[in-house]
Structure formats: structure tokens, C-alpha cells
Amino acid sequence: MMTMKVGFIGLGIMGKPMSKNLIKAGYSLVVSDRNPDVIAELLAAGAETATTAKAIAEQCDVIITMLPNSPHVKEVALGENGIIEGAKPGLVVIDMSSIAPLASREISEALKLKGVEMLDAPVSGGEPKAIDGTLSVMVGGDKATFDRYYDLMKAMAGSVVHTGEIGAGNVTKLANQVIVALNIAAMSEALTLATKAGVNPDLVYQAIRGGLAGSTVLDAKAPMVMDRNFKPGFRIDLHIKDLANALDTSHGVGAQLPLTAAVMEMMQALRADGLGTADHSAIACYYEKLAKVEITR
């Protein structure tokens, strides 16, 4: 399967290291992005380049997209000079963006008319796991197609799990993003309490991380907050997008997400304060502002 030609569209914080891991695994890659510096970097790593999604579709067996939101994926897949214009029957699109489940289904249906199969395969783990090739991938779509391209996805991931039909991958990602957002908020709330009460938050973190309150989120984000390092592994702006998709989906299926709605308001307040491009660990800043403290070691 490594003789297949792979297209990769979207070389941002996540897409760039993911594409590099595919090259390291021996895949032949054709890339596209709006940033010429990133394109130059990938060319130096051994990739080829194409100027449009259509051009990539004309020469590739499978295309991976890693883009910010539903409209971007729709434009690349179905728009002018998009994948659909260059696609031949048998092409497979693996969309690893985090988008609305309904959008995944709509794009898939449109591509199917051209004989193109689609998997929705969003990822979790942020930039560090994208670099290490240890992302968690949650995949919706045809199981036989999933099986055929499992090794390709595994070259970028620690785990790759099929969760159901098209759209199921993004429903799973929304569940993931709800848990992550609420965990960061809970951590921020707890460390604000400790700081305001005059207890060293780093010692609190060290004391609780091995118990039931310990989590991947706590270990990843508490040190960032205490070091005042809000360089984005995952931006607040993007998490707002995910929570908006979660709330929209919940309204459509009749589920209630009161805690998600509360954290969404916190994130929107942070964006209004100019922190939209900060890492989502900056949720702590919302609590710090209210309590008039700073969580530091």
C-alpha cells in the first residue's frame, strides 16, 4: 500500500507534523497549503507539491484534508478547483479536520456521486502528539475502506478506532472536546481555589496527579498554566468552534449540555479579552481574572 500516492491538504499546526510522519513512514506525498514557507519545508522533506485540490485529486489515490472548519473542507472538496473536479472513481478522501458531523455526511454524499469514498477521521492529542505520531484518531465511514487505509492513518497515530458510519468520527471528536474543555475548566477552578487559599498550586498538582483527579489533561495543561506558557497547541478559537458544533449537534438530537454551554461562555469571554489565539489552557485566565490571582509555581 505504500506505493500509493497520498495527497495532503492543510499544513498548519497539526497538518505539517502529520504529513512529515507520513514521509518518514515511506509514503509518497503531494501537498498543498497557502503558506509558501511550509510548502518549502515539506519539499525539503521529500514531498511534491500541487497548486490546487483538483490537481492533487488528478494524481493521487487517497487525499487527507486537515483544515480549520466545515466551510474550508466543503470548499476544498466541492468548490472551484476542488477535489471533486479532479476526482476519478475509486479515490478516497480522509478528512482529519474537526467539523460538524452533518457537514461530513453532506460532503460524503456529494463525493459519492463521483465514485469517491470518504472517511471522517478527526484527531485528538494536539501538536505534541502530532509531532510524535501518537495521535488518537476516531473514524467514521465504510468499515472496508477503514481497514484498507488503517496503516496509513496509523503512521500518524498511537490509536485508530472505527466508531461507526460517516459522521461518527466527528461525533466522537465532539465528545472528546467536551471532556477536554470541562477538564481544563475543572483544573483551572481547582488551582484557582488553591492559589486564592494561599497554597502552592504546584504542590497541589503534585499531590493530586496520582489520584482519581489525575488525568492526561491535568498533566498536559497544569504545567503550562503555572509556567505562563499559553503558546497554542490548540487555540481557544478552535475549541470554541468545536463546542459550537457540539451544542448545535446536541440541539439536533435533543441532548442537554449545560456544562459545555458554561465553558463555551468562558471561552467567548477570553476571546473578547484578546486570548482567542492562546492555548485552551488559558481558560485558567478566566478564573484568575475573577479571583484576582495568578496561578504560578
Task: Report the location of each language-model feature.
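NAD(P)+-binding Rossmann beta1-loop-alpha1 motif at the extreme N-terminus of oxidoreductases
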Residues: 1-66, 91, 96, 295
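Rossmann-fold dinucleotide-binding core
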Residues: 11, 99-177
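Hydrophobic beta-strand scaffold residues
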Residues: 29, 49, 117-119, 160, ...
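Rossmann-fold NAD(P) dinucleotide-binding segment
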Residues: 53-65, 69-117
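Active-site-proximal catalytic alpha-helix in oxidoreductases
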Residues: 132-140, 161, 165-197, 206-220, ...
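Interdomain hinge/lid region at the active-site interface
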Residues: 166, 170, 214-281, 286-287
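Beta-strand segments within the central parallel beta-sheet cores of soluble alpha/beta enzyme folds
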Residues: 202-209, 261-265
